[in-house]
């Protein structure tokens, strides 16, 4: 049984220690229930091991009694091991609303990231069913670079009843350690790439992607499927002339598993990326944005959906995300025109 926490206590934000693990698990279980899909945060021994190994860097809000009233973490979820996500954040219901806990935990995580040699870029996924995390991200100097349409099912937010349909998220980035890169720009997106890279906090050199796909190597994919969300993320590790065939076979496999959102990550460090983008667009994928340092080189997000987005229910608080969304929606509509049979949607 989860012990109640006395409201109104003083608290501080600190680095996670093993004795905090049960309190973090209780917090997640109390808010999200026992079906929470990421087991690291509801199984104390796993959380201790992940923090010990450095794969997770947890920050906790703790009272003088030792009660855990908040948690946020940095963790690696991109192909590049030097890019960490800021997430797994939550605050006890009695400690929400103007206390600043979430902001302090996220700030604490960035401070710890700057102290470590293995954390060079951090990103977050502010949800678009309410403005809080969008405001937090902006206040911490993150910049929106991509938007994940229909990422999370409404069931994820059922306990707090904050969504009626699938929830879209932003992808916001901040550079902690400079690492200049060359970006190969697909011809299809030559006019809009500069907008997605506006206010970039690191150096980028842009060249047009003009090299054709080659048969000298084979296409290599690394796919993650998130069954609870019905989402698949396909990291393209190597591009070859067989990419259209390999990708179509992978998509067919994923749709048979019940996947409703397919994301494809391409490296814009590859001079052939433009032809891969053209292939994906001809198969119903639309542009989602850019991903700094995603493969160590930058990445490009392409998306395909089974369900048509309810665009009007995507709540965007800032002008920048509204501008990017308009460009993304325009490409979604253009791709529908290229694929009249399925209207730009996977599996329909």
Residue positions per predicted region:
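Conserved N-terminal entry element of GNAT/NAT acetyltransferase domains
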Residues: 1-19
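A conserved beta-strand-loop-helix scaffold within acyl/acetyltransferase catalytic domains
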Residues: 15-93, 126-127, 222-230, 237-242, ...
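Short hydrophobic/aromatic beta-strand element in the GNAT-like acyltransferase core
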Residues: 56-60, 71, 169, 277, ...
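Conserved acetyl-CoA-binding loop-helix of GNAT-fold acetyltransferases
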Residues: 91, 97-113, 122-124, 243-251
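Conserved GNAT acetyl-CoA-binding A-motif
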Residues: 112-127, 257-267
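Conserved catalytic-core motifs of GNAT/GCN5-like acyltransferases
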Residues: 123-125, 141-161, 286-297
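Conserved active-site alpha-helix within GNAT-family acetyltransferase domains
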Residues: 128-146, 156, 271-287
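Non-catalytic interaction/regulatory modules that flank or connect domains
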Residues: 197-289, 293
């Amino acid at each position: 049984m989860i012990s109640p926490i006395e409201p109104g206590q003083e608290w501080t934000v600190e680095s996670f220690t093993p004795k905090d693990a049960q309190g973090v698990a209780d917090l997640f279980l109390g808010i999200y229930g026992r079906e929470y899909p990421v087991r690291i945060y509801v199984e104390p021994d796993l959380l201790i091991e992940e923090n010990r190994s450095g794969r997770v860097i947890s920050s906790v809000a703790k009272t003088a009694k030792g009660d855990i009233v908040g948690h946020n973490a940095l963790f690696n979820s991109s192909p590049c091991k030097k890019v960490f996500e800021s997430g797994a954040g939550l605050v006890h219901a009695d400690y929400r609303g103007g206390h600043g806990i979430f902001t302090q935990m996220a700030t604490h995580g960035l401070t710890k990231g700057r102290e470590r040699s293995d954390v060079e870029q951090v990103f977050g996924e502010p949800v678009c069913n309410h403005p809080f995390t969008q405001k937090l991200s902006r206040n911490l100097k993150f910049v929106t670079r991509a938007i994940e349409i229909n990422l999370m099912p409404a069931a994820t937010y059922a306990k707090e009843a904050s969504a009626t349909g699938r929830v879209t998220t932003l992808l916001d980035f901040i550079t902690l350690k400079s690492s200049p890169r060359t970006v190969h720009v697909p011809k299809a997106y030559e006019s809009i790439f500069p907008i997605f890279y506006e206010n970039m906090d690191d150096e980028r050199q842009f060249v047009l992607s003009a090299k054709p796909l080659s048969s000298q190597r084979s296409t290599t994919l690394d796919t993650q499927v998130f069954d609870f969300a019905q989402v698949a993320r396909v990291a393209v590790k190597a591009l070859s002339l067989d990419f259209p065939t390999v990708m179509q076979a992978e998509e067919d496999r994923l749709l048979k598993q019940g996947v409703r959102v397919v994301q494809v990550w391409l490296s814009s460090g590859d001079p052939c990326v433009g032809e891969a983008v053209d292939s994906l667009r001809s198969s119903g994928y639309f542009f989602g944005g850019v991903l700094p340092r995603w493969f160590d080189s930058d990445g490009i997000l392409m998306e395909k959906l089974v369900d048509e987005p309810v665009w009007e229910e995507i709540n965007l608080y800032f002008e920048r995300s509204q501008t990017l969304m308009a460009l993304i929606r325009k490409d979604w509509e253009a791709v529908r025109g290229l694929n009249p049979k399925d209207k730009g949607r996977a599996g329909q």
